[in-house]
């Protein structure tokens, strides 16, 4: 086993990869207006444009349950490098959006095949669908990094040594997601939005170099890859998420997608009974502690994404701030997440694991409730206090959830457990953003019906302009207040599965 200082240094490129991959979850929040303008996407198509975020989360979460197990079979180091390479490839694709004008030179080529191919690629690369598709490719690579990292930590550390690195893993993922909007705002102040993705390339290559030289090769576990099981799990996750995207919009379609997803899950259950080495062992869900940790992570992810999306939107609209100001406001919460994660790791190592969980949920629920009381005149110190409290609360939850899940399985299932506990959070985020976009759009339209002023012609409201703006601001405030209340309620519900988390750390090689 490596000495402790070398192991800590070796994790630097691993954590850096997670941070920058997570950054791309939300970087689109602040550059979306530029993307829509560049690709001539109308404001009325905002629900479609939101798939630049939802699609990333969908790709991210779909591979998480299986990549931990894949790294068991093919090796942690190889899978991490391969995943980062896929992330870089997807970044190149997104960066090339609206930038393939050179293909016009092939429009006069003698070969009709080359002419048609060049024309097709040029046309599709200037569409929103291209951005969504290349973002999904990015996400497939990024989604593997967290479960593989947790498996690397489990291989490298023993017992109580794992708590803090696991907390930092989650903190890097959360901090990257929250830094994303700020990063996007800064880059687009000086360059085109495509540079957000061009910059992923040198960063990704540096991470790969660090992994090559610092991470040792682990001994893969012998076994065959369950390809059919992998496809079924990915299909189930995608269908359920697509169903949630119809929430409040198309109930029959919602029921169809969710039902189909559940059918796939049932099919996987019976398939796993016939496999000696299933990609996701069903038996691990028979452990109430593992199941509780995943349910809690689901609520955690949904509440977190509501907070991440609502804060910058509220700043940019009813508070009349810029994209950069929205990112800077969110940064106040980011600062507290790693602090809470380290504190949660220490509390989990020293006391009952559930203590950090209870405190985190209470802090989050309380701070989100306070945010639901924000008005257009909210300012410091109240705003900063609420944001710091929320970030600290989200951070406190990382270590106890992860440690409880990893503590409840044997060494043979650690890779699969790492993949599933990572996936549950991002599945919550994917379901949360999909449902939020659909329900929020419908709610906004319903609230607009309550405005007395005639707004049938956008930009030319009858009556007094200031009265119209005031009522529109109140509509926005009501909508955002509802979002924060939903997030707070999800945290309170999370107290129920928190009761079942592992009560105390085990004195063993697991945790």
Stretches with model-predicted labels:
Residues 1-23, 37, 108:
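Cytosolic juxtamembrane N-terminal segment immediately preceding the first transmembrane helix
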Residues 9-16, 23, 29-30, 53, ...:
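12-transmembrane solute porter fold
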Residues 27-43, 70, 153, 313-320:
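Membrane-interface helix caps of multi-pass secondary transporters
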Residues 31-62, 100, 106, 126-133, ...:
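Extracellular/periplasmic helix-loop-helix junction of adjacent transmembrane segments
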Residues 54-68, 146, 150, 331-344:
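Central cavity-lining transmembrane alpha-helices of secondary-active solute carriers
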Residues 64-228:
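Helix-loop-helix hairpins in multi-pass membrane proteins, especially solute transporters
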């Amino acid at each position: 086993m490596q000495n402790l200082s070398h192991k800590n240094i070796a994790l630097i490129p691993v954590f850096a990869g997670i941070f920058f991959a997570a950054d791309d979850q939300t970087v689109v929040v602040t550059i979306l207006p530029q993307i829509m303008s560049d690709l001539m996407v109308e404001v009325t198509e905002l629900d479609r444009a939101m798939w630049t975020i939802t699609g990333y989360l969908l790709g991210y979460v779909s591979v998480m349950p299986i990549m931990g197990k894949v790294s068991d079979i093919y090796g942690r180091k190889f899978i991490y490098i391969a995943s980062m390479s896929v992330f870089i490839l997807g970044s190149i694709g997104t960066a090339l959006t609206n930038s393939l004008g050179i293909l016009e030179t092939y429009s006069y080529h003698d070969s009709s095949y080359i002419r048609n191919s060049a024309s097709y690629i040029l046309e599709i690369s200037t569409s929103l669908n291209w951005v969504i598709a290349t973002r999904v490719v990015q996400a497939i690579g990024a989604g593997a990094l967290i479960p593989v990292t947790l498996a690397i930590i489990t291989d490298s550390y023993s017992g109580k040594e794992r708590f803090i690195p696991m907390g930092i893993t989650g903190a890097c993922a959360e901090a990257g997601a929250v830094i994303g909007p700020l990063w996007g705002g800064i880059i687009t102040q000086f360059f085109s939005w495509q540079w957000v993705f061009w910059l992923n390339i040198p960063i990704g290559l540096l991470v790969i170099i660090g992994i090559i030289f610092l991470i040792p090769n682990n001994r893969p576990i012998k076994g065959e890859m369950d390809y059919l099981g992998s496809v079924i799990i990915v299909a189930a996750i995608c269908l359920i998420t697509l169903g949630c995207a119809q929430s409040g919009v198309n109930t029959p379609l919602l029921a169809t997608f969710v039902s189909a997803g559940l059918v796939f899950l049932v099919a996987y259950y019976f398939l796993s009974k016939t496999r000696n080495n299933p990609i996701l062992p069903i038996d691990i869900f028979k452990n109430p502690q593992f199941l509780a940790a995943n349910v809690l992570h689901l609520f955690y992810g949904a509440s977190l994404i509501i907070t991440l999306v609502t804060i910058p939107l509220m700043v940019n609209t009813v508070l009349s701030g810029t994209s950069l100001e929205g990112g800077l406001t969110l940064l106040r919460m980011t600062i507290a997440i790693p602090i809470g994660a380290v504190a949660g790791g220490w509390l989990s190592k020293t006391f009952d694991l559930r203590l950090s969980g209870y405190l985190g949920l209470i802090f989050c629920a309380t701070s989100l409730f306070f945010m639901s009381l924000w008005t257009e005149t909210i300012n410091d110190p109240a705003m900063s206090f609420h944001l710091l409290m929320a970030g600290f609360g989200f951070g406190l939850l990382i270590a106890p959830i992860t440690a409880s899940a990893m503590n409840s399985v044997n060494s043979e299932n650690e890779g699969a457990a790492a993949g599933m506990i990572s996936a549950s959070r991002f599945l919550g985020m994917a379901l949360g953003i999909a449902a939020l976009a659909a329900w929020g759009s419908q709610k906004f339209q319903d609230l607009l019906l309550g405005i007395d002023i005639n707004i049938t012609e956008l930009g030319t409201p009858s009556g007094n302009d200031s009265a119209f703006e005031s009522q529109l601001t109140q509509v926005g405030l009501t909508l955002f207040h509802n979002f924060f209340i939903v997030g707070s309620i999800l945290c309170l519900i999370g107290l129920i599965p928190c009761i079942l988390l592992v009560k105390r750390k085990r004195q063993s090689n697991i945790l």
